[in-house]
């Protein structure tokens, strides 16, 4: 599974681990992604992988639960 947000396209960035002695080694900063059931603009409900920032901002709409 690619670590990419389906809504905003956020993906991993590269950076450094920096030790106390100021030694540097490469690392990856990965986005905080979650799989949620979301209602698409067409009205279809689908499972999508989105970052938590998109969830909190309301960019992704969760479907209304159907109760029997």
From Swiss-Prot:
- UniProt keyword annotation of Transmembrane helix present: no
Biological process, per Gene Ontology:
translation
The record's GO CC annotations read: ribonucleoprotein complex; ribosome
Please report any disulfide bonds recorded for this protein chain, giving both cysteine positions.
none
Q: What domain of life is recorded for the organism?
A: Bacteria
Concerning InterPro entries, the annotation shows:
Bacterial_rp_bL28 (IPR050096), Ribosomal_bL28 (IPR026569), Ribosomal_bL28/bL31-like_sf (IPR034704), Ribosomal_bL28_bact-type (IPR001383), Ribosomal_bL28_sf (IPR037147)
**Name of the protein in its database record:** Large ribosomal subunit protein bL28
Q: Which segments carry the region annotation Disordered?
A: 1-30
SUPFAM superfamilies according to UniProt: L28p-like (SSF143800)
List, as start-end ranges, the regions of compositional bias called Polar residues.
13-22
Q: Keywords for this entry? A: Ribonucleoprotein, Ribosomal protein
Instruction: Reply yes or no: does the keyword Ribosomal protein apply.
Output: yes
Record-linked HAMAP family: Ribosomal_bL28
Q: Which GO terms describe its molecular function?
A: structural constituent of ribosome
Q: What's this protein's family per the entry?
A: Belongs to the bacterial ribosomal protein bL28 family.
**What's the short name of a Pfam family annotated to this entry?**
Ribosomal_L28
């Amino acid at each position: 599974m690619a670590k990419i947000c389906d809504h905003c396209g956020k993906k991993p960035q590269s950076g450094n681990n920096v030790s106390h002695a100021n030694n540097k080694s490469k690392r990856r900063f990965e986005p905080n992604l979650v799989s949620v059931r979301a209602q698409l603009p067409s009205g279809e409900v689908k499972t999508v992988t989105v970052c938590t920032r998109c969830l909190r901002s309301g960019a992704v709409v969760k479907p209304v639960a159907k109760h029997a």
